[in-house]
């Protein structure tokens, strides 16, 4: 015996990413690296990149859900920038969050002022 103790025959556990531990799709390690390299603070806590990755994943999922609905309403199976624009601008909270953002190839929301619409003519009853 070479003095390795009781756990000599046990293999090391399979490595599990921080994204997998947190149950996220977005990369926690990459977010952590960006936080460190971006000079936002001298030190970055262990929970900060997990929280930020979760927030980013939630926002992406929310926008994609609404854009998918917009694509389906237009009888399309592929999301294009127009669908993203319609999704963001028709949602009050996302519109406020992304008010300063221009979506390339997004177009504008269809909107006709009420004054410009033709007047309703009612038939005079006798």
From Swiss-Prot:
Annotated spans, Disordered: 1-20
Ubl conjugation in keyword set: yes
Lineage: Eukaryota, Metazoa, Echinodermata, Eleutherozoa, Echinozoa
Sites of N5-methylglutamine modification: 105
Any one Pfam family match given in the protein's UniProt record, by short name: Histone_H2A_C
Organism listed in the record: Strongylocentrotus purpuratus (Purple sea urchin)
An annotated GO BP: heterochromatin formation
Name of the protein in its database record: Late histone H2A.L3
UniProt-listed CDD domains: HFD_H2A
Domain of life assignment: Eukaryota
Modified residues (N-acetylserine): 2
């Amino acid at each position: 015996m070479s003095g390795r103790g009781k756990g000599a025959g046990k293999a090391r556990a399979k490595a599990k990413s921080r994204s997998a531990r947190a149950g996220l799709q977005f990369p926690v390690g990459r977010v952590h690296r960006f936080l460190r390299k971006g000079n936002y603070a001298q030190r970055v806590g262990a929970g900060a990149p997990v929280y930020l990755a979760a927030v980013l994943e939630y926002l992406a999922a929310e926008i994609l859900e609404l854009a998918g609905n917009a694509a389906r309403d237009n009888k399309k199976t592929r999301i294009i920038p127009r669908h993203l624009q319609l999704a963001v601008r028709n949602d009050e909270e996302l519109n406020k969050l992304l008010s300063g953002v221009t979506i390339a190839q997004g177009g504008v929301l269809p909107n006709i002022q009420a004054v410009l619409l033709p007047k309703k003519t009612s038939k005079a009853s006798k």
